[in-house]
Amino acid sequence: MKNLEKRRSRYLQDSPPTRLGGLAANLGRIASFSKYADHLEIVDSVMQESKWFIEWTASDFDILQAAELVKLQVQLALWQLQSKNRWDEESWRLELAADSKQ
């Protein structure tokens, strides 16, 4: 938990646009790593980190932007759950890769 608090403190030092850039970079990582069957743990970790980023930063945006971030957070949680049962399906991973770029 201490490490998570350090990460949160460090993350919140960045400006909101920089934080959104970090989130966008994570979505790109999800897209890239999802193409490979042996990267489940990496993708899961990046999804979890992205959900935390949203949790920590959504309140710094107006209500409509925050709602979009929360919508993305829910999508990330859904992908995480689905990945546990469908990761071995290449077609699902490729769909995840495509969807995470949008």
Regions found by a protein language model. Give the residues of each.
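Surface-exposed peri-terminal alpha-helical interaction modules
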Residues: 1-102
